[in-house]
């Protein structure tokens, strides 16, 4: 049984839509990553992580979890 040309055309259009959607999603992810980098999120996270590392042992020591 041979598929009709309408079926083949539908499959081609469907596959093109899937490929376009995947390329568009990748481009949006790249744009989001670039926007976060420009906003300095990495530096902000580094500062926050430094504060956590600085104050967490002291807080755990006060709660009795870590011997100082």
Swiss-Prot record:
Q: Which GO terms describe its biological process?
A: defense response to bacterium; defense response to fungus; killing of cells of another organism
- Please provide the record's keywords in A-Z order: Antibiotic, Antimicrobial, Cytolysis, Disulfide bond, Fungicide, Hemolysis, Secreted, Signal
**According to its UniProt record, where is this protein located?**
Secreted
Is-annotated flag, keyword Ribonucleoprotein? no
Range of residues in the leader sequence: 1-25
Maturation-removed propeptide residues: 26-39
Provide the function of this protein: This homodimer composed of two cationic amphipathic alpha-helical peptides has antimicrobial activities against E.coli (MIC=3.1 uM), S.aureus (MIC=3.1 uM), and S.cerevisiae (MIC=3.1 uM). It also shows histamine-releasing activity (66.4% at 10 uM) and a weak hemolytic activity (10.5% at 50 uM).
Provide the family line. Answer: Belongs to the formicidae venom precursor-01 superfamily.
Quaternary organization: Homo- or heterodimer with PLP7 (AC A0A348G6I9); disulfide-linked.
Identification of the protein by name: U-poneritoxin(01)-Om4a
């Amino acid at each position: 049984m041979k598929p009709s040309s309408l079926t083949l055309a539908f499959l081609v259009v469907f596959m093109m839509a899937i490929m376009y959607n995947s390329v568009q999603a990748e481009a949006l992810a790249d744009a989001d990553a670039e926007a976060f980098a420009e906003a300095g999120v990495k530096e902000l996270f580094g500062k926050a992580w430094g504060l956590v590392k600085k104050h967490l042992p002291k807080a755990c020591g006060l709660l009795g979890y870590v011997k100082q």
